């Protein structure tokens, strides 16, 4: 693949989308540097699982592809936070960024730079980036108000402070992944629930009869074992698009045996309807 990219990139100077996802990583820095040298209009780039790549690739993309909107570097484990921060300073149009498994790159330092520069960011995957803490997530919350999807699964250092900052500042948030974030407590859940109520008037005014449809539509709190049913039920009640019912699971609570009593509105309706059915005579 590396030689193929080296030979073809100079011939496709108007390329806007390039998917280089690999099962057996072959891509090297010189290929990405060639892409950056010739494909200046590139908007969507997938380099996932290219663990041979180093910061050289990020530096090249920063200078050669400033119009990037979507970048997937999940599984690129050799990138550092310095390289990622450098990229963020030049690629300010980024809206979709996948950093899943980029343990060395996704640090609070890098996230602060992303929050400062990438203010159009809408989707960010930080799954299993175990060095991410509250400072980084709060920087995102303050700097990226249009954030709609954030995956923090496995970010074991974050606490309620991260969720509270997101609830208060990211009014467009639709999907939040908190799997195995075991420092999360009821305080975070109530902040999400209350943010829905608190922001209703503001959103109504700003949208002028186009009230923001649904709020949270996906929430993963699996293995967040400190949470209690009343707090999670409050979130479920505040966001009608969160479902626990069969076939529509969007509130994921697996591994939390104490949360089995939490139900969405349609699950309650189904239960009441079933209870109202006449029982057969014996």
Task: Report the location of each language-model feature.
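The conserved beta-strand core of Leucine-Rich Repeat
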Residues: 1-282
């Amino acid at each position: 693949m590396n030689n193929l990219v080296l030979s073809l990139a100079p011939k496709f100077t108007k390329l806007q989308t390039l998917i280089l996802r690999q099962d057996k990583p072959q891509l090297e820095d010189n290929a990405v540097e060639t892409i950056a040298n010739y494909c200046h209009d590139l908007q969507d780039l997938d380099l996932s699982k290219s663990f041979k790549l180093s910061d050289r690739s990020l530096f090249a993309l920063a200078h050669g592809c400033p119009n990037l909107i979507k970048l997937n570097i999940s599984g690129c484990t050799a990138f550092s936070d310095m390289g990622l921060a450098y990229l963020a300073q030049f690629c300010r149009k980024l809206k979709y960024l996948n950093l899943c498994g980029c343990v060395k790159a996704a640090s609070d330092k890098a996230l602060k730079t992303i929050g400062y520069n990438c203010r159009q960011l809408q989707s960010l995957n930080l799954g299993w980036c175990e060095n991410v803490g509250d400072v980084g997530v709060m920087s995102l919350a303050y700097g990226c108000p249009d954030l709609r999807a954030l995956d923090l699964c496995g970010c074991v250092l974050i606490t309620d402070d991260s969720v509270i900052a997101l609830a208060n500042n990211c009014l467009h948030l639709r999907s939040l992944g908190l799997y195995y974030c075991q420092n999360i407590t009821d305080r975070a859940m109530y902040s999400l629930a209350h943010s829905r109520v608190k922001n209703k008037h503001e959103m109504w005014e700003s949208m002028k009869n186009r009230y923001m449809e649904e709020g949270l539509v996906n929430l993963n709190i699996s293995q967040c074992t400190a949470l209690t049913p009343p707090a999670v039920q409050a979130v479920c009640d505040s966001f009608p698009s969160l479902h626990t019912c069969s076939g529509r699971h969007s509130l994921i609570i697996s591994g939390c045996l104490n949360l089995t009593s939490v139900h969405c509105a349609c699950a309650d309706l189904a239960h009441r309807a079933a209870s109202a059915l006449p029982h057969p005579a014996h």
